[in-house]
């Protein structure tokens, strides 16, 4: 049944399962390609044992300005190990916790150097400048960080902040625009393949 659901989804949204986006001029080995994408954003190290993409698919999306973007939708699976000390002081593995998040990479995006999260966290040095909007409700729901203070100030107009608030109205997760590459990554708990 799961296979049929995946096939139906692939046809409906023209998803190319386990395929790299077409914008990559020289296709990489899948392992190298995924490793490259995971290095671009500081959210793919959540597992102490494992961090991998068991499923991904590529397609093309058209935005509200009729511009087409290469897109890769993915499942991110990570595994954490819980360890405790026994009565003799030995480190003992108690259990493994498996978790899944789903996300999307969108390529050829004009915006760079911005990270927005619904979580109570910060990002690595790439997004080191916290930003607060003039809207108290948005500041309570979203944590915003930029890689360059001036660019962040220019980018976060009232209209853009309202778009972010609308985007996160029904979503939880992290939205990151890479500081130097024209790539966006969104990662959250909503299963995107259903």
List where the protein language model places each region.
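Charged, low-complexity intrinsically disordered regions
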Residues: 4-194
């Amino acid at each position: 049944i799961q296979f049929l659901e995946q096939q139906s989804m692939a046809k409906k949204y023209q998803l190319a399962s386990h395929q790299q986006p077409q914008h990559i001029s020289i296709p990489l080995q899948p392992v190298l390609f995924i490793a490259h994408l995971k290095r671009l954003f500081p959210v793919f190290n959540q597992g102490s044992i494992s961090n991998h993409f068991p499923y991904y698919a590529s397609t093309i999306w058209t935005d509200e300005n009729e511009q087409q973007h290469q897109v890769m939708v993915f499942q991110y699976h990570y595994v954490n190990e819980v360890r405790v000390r026994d009565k003799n002081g030995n480190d003992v593995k108690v259990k493994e916790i498996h978790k899944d998040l789903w996300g999307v990479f969108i390529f050829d995006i004009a915006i760079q150097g911005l990270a927005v999260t619904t979580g109570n966290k910060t990002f690595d040095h790439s997004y080191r400048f916290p930003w607060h909007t003039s809207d108290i409700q948005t500041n309570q729901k979203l944590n915003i960080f930029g890689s360059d203070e001036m660019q962040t100030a220019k980018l976060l107009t009232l209209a853009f902040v309202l778009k972010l608030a609308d985007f996160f109205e029904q979503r939880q997760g992290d939205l990151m625009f890479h500081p130097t590459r024209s790539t966006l990554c969104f990662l959250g708990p909503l299963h995107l393949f259903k």
